[in-house]
């Protein structure tokens, strides 16, 4: 049985090292791997001994925590209906503002194409009886999101038979043949958790852990890659809780009542893992259940535009049917009042697999490397020492 367990764990770790598939699982035996300290010797007494004190039971570990998510599996978390202008019908231009209508939400259940997050932090763990860890991380994180424009409710007004947009005009077309991507700045991030070695038999250890993480980075850059309305915004601002129509000055430098776009990230995770110590190597394999959410308050961001036209244009949006600006300088053939919203996103899969190994030196220092897959493709590195 021991040989079989060794073979399974070693094969899992070595087989996953060639490819990397928010929160790491960690080695279940970590609370009991470093039993000696660089300043104080470890204590191996009996917890039931009446002469034992809490000073003997508690130890401290410090180190580096790096977590690199290359692709988190996310989907939008929105309502099935979306309020905007009624869809155009026929070939006639619109002589009046579009009628508000409740339409099928193109963002409902949309999967994100790419979601990345990179965290570097300090790691601190309080150990009790070489069996339990209470730990936290303090550091910084940055992220990247990319998805189809439908997932961001990219909309605009088309076919309006007027020379300028009116205050009561609302979008009537949804753009789904485009891509939206955003980069966040580097923001403060923290996490807390607990880990326990629940069962030990020889060199095998079964353990469990629970963690919670939070961060709120601001959107540093927003790119909309669309033939009908392509634009980039640095440090975008938008409207929270604002229904259509947006303010007529939305997207201009004089727009008011806007706020910075930021993403509130929360995640919790519970895991169960099994490890087996092989001299200085301790490979492990574990399963995890997690839920992550990315909430930007459904902020709506308007395409940048000029307050007054220059060369009969307020944006660089091209003509759609090729007719260009007619003699009356009407806006019929160009996309107007373009905007998008940052919808709430959540985990598309709750269960994942983690495979890793820990290298221990002199019972005082340890380095853990881990890969995760199924619900995300990620890598984790943790280096620490015991006082």
From Swiss-Prot:
Its main location: membrane. InterPro entries: Major_OMP_Chlamydia (IPR000604). It is found in: Cell outer membrane. GO terms for molecular function: porin activity; structural molecule activity. It holds the Pfam family Chlam_OMP. One of its GO terms (cellular component) is cell outer membrane. The keyword Ion transport applies. Keywords: Cell outer membrane, Cell shape, Disulfide bond, Ion transport, Membrane, Porin, Signal, Transmembrane, Transmembrane beta strand, Transport. Residues 1-22 form the signal peptide. GO terms for biological process: monoatomic ion transport; regulation of cell shape. Transmembrane segments: none annotated. It is a multi-pass membrane protein. Part of a disulfide cross-linked outer membrane complex (COMC) composed of the major outer membrane porin (MOMP), the small cysteine-rich protein (OmcA) and the large cysteine-rich periplasmic protein (OmcB). Belongs to the chlamydial porin (CP) (TC 1.B.2) family. In elementary bodies (EBs, the infectious stage, which is able to survive outside the host cell) provides the structural integrity of the outer envelope through disulfide cross-links with the small cysteine-rich protein and the large cysteine-rich periplasmic protein. It has been described in publications as the Sarkosyl-insoluble COMC (Chlamydia outer membrane complex), and serves as the functional equivalent of peptidoglycan. Permits diffusion of specific solutes through the outer membrane. This is Major outer membrane porin. The gene is ompA.
